[in-house]
From Swiss-Prot:
Active site: D47
CDD domains membership: PseudoU_synth_EcTruB (cd02573), PUA_TruB_bacterial (cd21152)
Keywords attached to this entry: Isomerase, tRNA processing
Database matches in SUPFAM superfamilies: Pseudouridine synthase, PUA domain-like
GO annotation (BP), single: tRNA pseudouridine synthesis
Pfam family, one: TruB_C_2
Organism lineage string: Bacteria, Pseudomonadati, Pseudomonadota, Gammaproteobacteria, Alteromonadales
Domain of life: Bacteria
Gene Ontology molecular-function annotations: RNA binding; tRNA pseudouridine(55) synthase activity
Organism of provenance: Shewanella loihica (strain ATCC BAA-1088 / PV-4)
Record has tRNA processing as a keyword: yes
Protein task: Responsible for synthesis of pseudouridine from uracil-55 in the psi GC loop of transfer RNAs.
Protein name: tRNA pseudouridine synthase B
UniProt cross-references to Gene3D superfamilies, sorted A to Z: Pseudouridine synthase, PUA domain
Database matches in NCBIfam families: TruB
Length: 315
């Protein structure tokens, strides 16, 4: 007999506005506890220094978190010029100070260098692993290990303002882009050094900025529900985004109850207009209930890749 999961079977995505000073895992565990969720996972860590958009997947939505991890991101970053640190942010030790002396044209030429497709060497102060251990652990021990440059793409790099020694930029980039590394490299190109003093993630995939909620807002709703002796889900669940928003960029294939039954049992089915070599979003019937994602197999049939478990909601 299957063991009953601890917590509530709740599915959806919380678009959390993470505060500074907390780890992404700490934020994840807080949200999981507030929702009393049986399962939860985030979609790519934000540095403790950083604030902003951190999608938290609950329940069956965790099956599609990789799609958000792979999605484009957008950041607002403020760099302090003239000072370089060992971590490329304000948490690190100052390693060099230099005068600031560049023209507006030199700044624009430096920014242009980072636009488009480039190769980036990850910072030693990152969570990437080398021989099973995060790079930042080697860095804290004063060790430097080899890192391979990785391809990244900066879709947009917009100048926002320059006030004194503080430069603010808006960056729309591909997954795996280290904003601290861009900031450090930019500082070196300008000949003065730089480090991040403010970093805010303003976008993940196509999620709307105004749908974010803070931990304080969630905890206030939980407290209100308890005070009014109401089920917390009445106040908390309306804030959840549907789990299929994680794969909203995929082509939709709508199937009948009969075909859905075959798919849910792991069997491929024949459908029309199935794209080649692309994942698709599978919906059911006129209500277009999301049932998962699939892909064309070698026989030209729609094969299930990752399906949701449809269950009755628990209190």
């Amino acid at each position: 007999m299957a063991r009953k999961p601890r917590g509530r079977l709740v599915d959806g995505i919380v678009l959390l506005d993470k505060d500074t000073g907390m780890s992404s895992n700490f934020a994840l565990q807080r949200v999981k506890r507030i929702y009393n969720a049986a399962k939860a996972g985030h979609t790519g860590a934000l540095d403790p220094l950083a604030t902003g958009m951190l999608p938290i997947c609950l329940g069956e939505a965790t099956k599609f978190s990789q799609h958000l991890l792979d999605a484009d991101k957008r950041y607002l970053v403020t760099a302090k010029l003239g000072v370089r640190t060992d971590t490329s942010d304000s948490d690190g030790e100052v390693v060099q100070t230099r005068p600031i002396n560049f023209t507006e044209q030199q700044l624009e030429e430096a920014l242009e260098h980072f636009r488009g497709e480039t190769m980036q060497v990850p910072s030693m102060y990152s969570a990437l692993k080398y021989q099973g251990q995060p790079l930042y652990k080697y860095a804290r021990e004063g060790k430097e290990v080899p890192r391979e440059a990785r391809p990244i793409k900066v879709f947009e790099l917009n100048f926002i303002k320059l006030e004194g020694d503080e430069l603010t930029l808006d960056i729309h980039c591909s997954k795996g882009t280290y904003i601290r590394t861009i900031t450090d490299d930019l500082g070196e190109m300008l000949g003065c050094g730089a480090h991040v003093i403010m970093l805010r993630r303003t976008g993940v995939a196509g999620y709307p900025y105004d749908k974010m909620v803070t931990l304080e807002q969630l905890e206030a709703l939980l407290a209100k529900a308890q005070e009014e002796e109401r089920p917390p889900k009445e106040l908390l669940d309306p804030l959840l985004l549907p789990m299929d928003t994680a794969v909203s960029g995929l082509k939709e294939i709508n199937v009948s109850d009969e075909l859905a039954h075959y798919l849910m049992n792991g069997n491929p089915v024949q459908v029309a207009n199935l794209p080649i070599d692309e994942l698709v979003r599978i919906t059911l019937g006129e209500a277009k209930q999301f049932v998962g994602i699939g892909q064309m197999n070698d026989d030209g049939l729609l094969a299930p890749k990752r399906l949701v478990v449809l269950h009755d909601e628990q209190a």
